[in-house]
Amino acid sequence: VMAGQQLEKRTDWKIPLRGFFYESSRKKRILAYYHQSQEHLMAEGLSMLLTDAPTHPDAPLWKASCEAYADYLRGISQLIEPYGILPSAVYEVDNTDYKNLYHEGEQVGLPSLEEYNAQVRNGIPLSKDFYLRRFPVAYQFRGFHAIVMGKAKAAFILARLFNDKALRDIATRQVEYIL
């Protein structure tokens, strides 16, 4: 899990971020959910390891990973004002993969790369090719509550782990927005 995480700040971006995860340890594509989300699982697993084995030789690495993701949540938490909701994810122009995308019927078809890029570029620019999207890139599905809740759950988990009121407030704001 940690091998697929951006632990250092991306100082080449307009908003230097760190802590987000990639789809794999090869770090070719940043992890982004478009309809459902399991984004909390990395924080949950690492938090459980820290709680259950705080003296393990790898515990400092687990903690550093959790701290990096907490920094990511804090860093993106003020970007959608006045709502205070967390943006969906960082997307890269020309970098998507549709092979595992389920779609309803042949008449719908898959989105084109041009459609994908247009949506990506409608995000908050980080650099020429990277954008932070307020909402997920919409293929066929719409809505983003599951994505917001995945991030909220991760923020609650890390708030408990670090006894961090700011993270707890970020998580609470996500639930308030949905309710």
Segments (PLM) and residue ranges:
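Glycan-recognition and catalytic cores of secretory/periplasmic carbohydrate-active enzymes
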Residues: 1-179
